[in-house]
Amino acid sequence: SGLKTARMLKREYGIPYETGYPVEAESRREFMERILPELGSHTLIVHQQIFANEIREWIREQKPDAKVTVAGWFRMDGTLKEEGDRHLEEEADLLKLVRDGAVDTVLGDPLLKRALPGWQGTYLDLPHYPVSGELHSVETSRDYWKKAGHRR
């Protein structure tokens, strides 16, 4: 993510840095218009940490008292975590976090819905390339395999 390099530049040369995820204003507005009406009292964002943190901030700009937790299977930097944020080790950790944390809304890759059997909350699709790869860039399974170079 570049954090290691940014921290070295800060330490060695005093160059300040900030974390964030650049998104065009129009794309951000459209995204927020789509998700805000669907958010419950406790939202869990399952994604890459810096992007998830950015979405958390967007939500709080509109709903200052919103309870928003970030979780993911990929490395999470401790200095960028808030209380309640979690690094997940396995799929069962996601279901446990949702149930134990009384989460009523999840933003995550569509494939992760399967890891929440019986959960009755609102699931909002937020594709994550390392989870589902090319699946969201094609219409059918046949298109996927064709794009992957298989001829069947």
List where the protein language model places each region:
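An N-terminal assembly and electron-transfer interface module characteristic of large anaerobic redox
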Residues: 1-152
